[in-house]
């Protein structure tokens, strides 16, 4: 009793009690050998006495019967004995075969292969916490490598590569919209060099959700590497539309998986876990490998009242945390914002208030094309107020069409009208949902603001709601659009004025909840600029993750994970690839520099015709200016440049220089020096020499 009271406050008091009892028995019966508790029949302890369970009764009157009964009891547990956890032992080979068969099943539906959801029992059997801790040392002999091809130090272009042994898999393949410095560029996608170099090792790509920064680059990737694609139903539906536009749908392998399903990719087992975001069917990924389990959250938030009723699967994330998580890769977009992210339903309430405020006026609402929940709420409020709804923007029309066809959005009969039909209805009976919430040039709202839209002209009485927050870097473009709308007399409402937008990304408290329930050994912040990543790393420290277990990576870095350490092990190609029209990758930094120079300082073309035999100048040189100076107002400067060109060509002929490249370089250098001296500007100089 004294020893019991001494150890009763310890967390493992049962272990100490059993130890003391065994010591007591050893003293009492010196001739008995102490057998480990797990190898002998479980003993029932009662008031200091040891009694034998009923299944091994002894006959005290017969030594022979006692011996025989003990032998039977010893044989009996081989087929039906329970282990120390109270679970019936199974044949390991049989269990392995059953699990293998379960993982290999698939259902053919609508021409796609959908992996069948593994039973949670199988997951528990494979994830026993004691067994896992014992096996972890063996598993982690093989390191897990994670290469970041995009998504770090930027918002967009998300792409991650996992490598373990001879197997690789990808997560997401997004795009990034160009900034104002990228003249003439339509899209920016990741560099696929490392993927194409290791194409034979890539087992597949898993997509977390259907936003452009996660699926926008997929069509360009699949043109170079034909690998299977996995995603939830809506995500695959949106991908199908993109691949159809690129004309490669038939040659691609698209596979639908649901939250809870397991996808086997080489040595990787990928489980999809439902999360909340601003688009339905978003998932986090639990990626199991011989090295351990890594959770990549994707874009997420914790919404307790989501529009579709599907809350984040906290229970499964907690269970994985109990089983053991090697690393957590967490969304960092809102890591600098305290508190919790508002529920999407909050926007619906604001819409109803603002729509009523706009009584008698035409409503124009700009939002992300893929924000199906937002579109649904706009339609619901419009229906309640007796307004018709028109869609403007090709991407918006495509997404709504796909979502309606798949049952993710409800459109009442007769409420949706074509954009060509808006003039048939009174202004106070219309709501126009449009793209362009980020101020993108050539988007529908942009064209409306600058009077370039073929069907919609902004009127002084219009009520415009911009239901989005500018992505970092887009603030100037959004401000430009707002200014133009105001100049035309429209009233503009945006997020800073009213709650017309809530984020789809977790704020600080939600991020800390994710860390607390998953209990990762290592933490890598992803999806954000440097300031977001560092803030998220600070949150990880605040919940108790050791600083040495937190790593802030960068695009092009390869991170190696083992049970003992996390480190940056190397570099991989991970630059920007610019898409300009149908050209992919043919626009580089040099081309962008030239375009910027042309835009800022203009162009000077020098044209001269020279006799091929004698080297005499037959005509010219002519000096032509475009975008540099107005010729009529700068005749003296142009004339000075012409005389300088004459002198340079004459010197070259005198020196018998017949290498026209050398002549062009001299012309370029001399004229460039003159122009900078006279104007402090550096136009592009383009010499053209023709031989006759």
Mark where each language-model region is.
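Intrinsically disordered, low-complexity RNA-associated tracts
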Residues: 26-139
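A glycine- and charged-residue-rich anion-binding loop/surface
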Residues: 152, 176-180, 184-187, 201-202, ...
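Conserved hydrophobic residues forming the short capping helix/wall of the S-adenosyl-L-methionine
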Residues: 243, 540, 675
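His/Asp/Glu-rich metal-coordinating catalytic cores
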Residues: 127-206, 211-425, 443-457, 476-480
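Short, Lys/Arg-enriched N-terminal segments with co-localized hydrophobic residues
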Residues: 1-25
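C-terminal tails and terminal domains of large nucleic-acid-associated
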Residues: 656-692
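Hard-cation-handling environments
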Residues: 337-467, 471-520, 524-656, 664, ...
């Amino acid at each position: 009793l004294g020893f019991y009271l001494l150890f009763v406050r310890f967390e493992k008091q049962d272990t100490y009690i059993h130890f003391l009892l065994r010591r007591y028995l050893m003293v009492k019966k010196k001739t008995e050998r102490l057998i480990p508790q797990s190898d002998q029949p479980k003993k029932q302890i009662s008031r200091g006495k040891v009694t034998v369970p009923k299944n091994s009764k002894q006959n005290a009157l017969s030594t022979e019967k006692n011996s025989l009964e003990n032998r039977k009891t010893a044989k009996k547990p081989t087929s039906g004995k329970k282990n120390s956890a109270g679970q019936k032992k199974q044949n390991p080979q049989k269990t392995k075969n059953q699990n293998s068969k379960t993982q290999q099943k698939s259902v053919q539906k609508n021409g796609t292969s959908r992996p069948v959801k593994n039973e949670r029992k199988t997951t528990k059997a494979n994830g026993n916490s004691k067994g896992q801790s014992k096996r972890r040392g063996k598993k982690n002999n093989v390191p897990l490598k994670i290469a970041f091809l995009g998504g770090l130090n930027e918002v967009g272009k998300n792409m991650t590569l996992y490598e373990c042994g001879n197997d690789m898999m990808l997560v997401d393949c997004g795009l990034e919209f160009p900034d104002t410095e990228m003249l003439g560029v339509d899209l920016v996608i990741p560099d696929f060099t490392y993927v194409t170099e290791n194409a034979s090792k890539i087992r597949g790509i898993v997509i977390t959700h259907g936003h452009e920064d996660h699926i926008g680059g997929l069509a360009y990737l699949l043109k170079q590497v034909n690998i299977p694609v996995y995603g939830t139903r809506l995500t695959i539906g949106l991908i199908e539309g993109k691949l159809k536009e690129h004309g490669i749908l038939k040659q691609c392998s698209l596979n639908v998986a649901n939250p809870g399903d397991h996808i086997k990719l080489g040595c990787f087992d990928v489980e999809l876990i439902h999360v909340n975001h601003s688009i339905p069917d978003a998932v986090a990924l639990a990626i199991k490998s011989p090295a351990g389990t890594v959770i990549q959250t994707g874009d997420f938030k914790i919404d307790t009242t989501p529009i579709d009723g599907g809350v984040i699967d906290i229970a499964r994330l907690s269970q994985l945390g109990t089983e053991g998580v090697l690393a957590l890769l967490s969304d960092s977009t809102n890591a600098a914002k305290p508190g919790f992210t508002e529920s999407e339903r909050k926007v619906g309430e604001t819409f109803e208030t603002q729509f009523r405020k706009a009584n008698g006026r035409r409503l124009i609402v700009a939002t992300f094309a893929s924000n199906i929940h937002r579109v649904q709420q706009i339609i619901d409020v419009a229906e309640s107020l007796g307004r018709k709804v028109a869609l403007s923007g090709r991407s918006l029309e495509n997404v709504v069409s796909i979502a309606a066809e798949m049952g993710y959005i409800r459109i009442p009969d007769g409420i949706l009208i074509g954009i060509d039909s808006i003039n048939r209805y009174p202004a106070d009976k219309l709501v126009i949902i449009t793209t362009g919430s980020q101020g993108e040039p050539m988007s529908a709202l942009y064209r409306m603001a600058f009077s370039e839209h073929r069907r919609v002209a902004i009127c002084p009485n219009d009520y415009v709601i911009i239901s989005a927050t500018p992505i970092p870097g887009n603030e100037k473009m959004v401000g430009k659009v707002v200014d133009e709308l105001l100049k035309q007399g429209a009233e503009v409402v945006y997020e800073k004025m009213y709650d017309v937008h809530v984020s789809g990304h977790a704020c600080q408290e939600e991020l800390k909840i994710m860390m607390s329930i998953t209990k990762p050994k290592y933490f890598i912040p992803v999806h954000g600029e440097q300031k977001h990543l560092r803030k998220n790393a600070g949150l990880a420290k605040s919940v108790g993750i050791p600083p040495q277990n937190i790593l802030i990576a960068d695009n092009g870095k390869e991170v190696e994970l083992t049970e003992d350490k996390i480190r940056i092990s190397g570099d991989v190609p991970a630059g920007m690839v610019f898409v300009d029209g149908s050209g992919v990758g043919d626009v580089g930094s040099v081309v962008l520099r030239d375009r910027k120079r042309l835009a800022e300082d203009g162009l000077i073309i020098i044209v001269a015709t020279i006799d091929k035999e004698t080297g005499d100048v037959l005509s010219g040189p002519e000096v032509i200016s475009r975008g540099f100076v107005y010729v009529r107002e700068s005749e003296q400067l142009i004339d000075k440049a012409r005389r300088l060109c004459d002198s340079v060509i004459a010197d070259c002929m005198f020196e018998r220089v017949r290498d026209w490249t050398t002549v062009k370089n001299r012309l370029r250098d001399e004229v460039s020096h003159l122009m900078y001296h006279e104007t402090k500007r550096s136009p592009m100089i383009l010499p053209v020499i023709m031989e006759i």
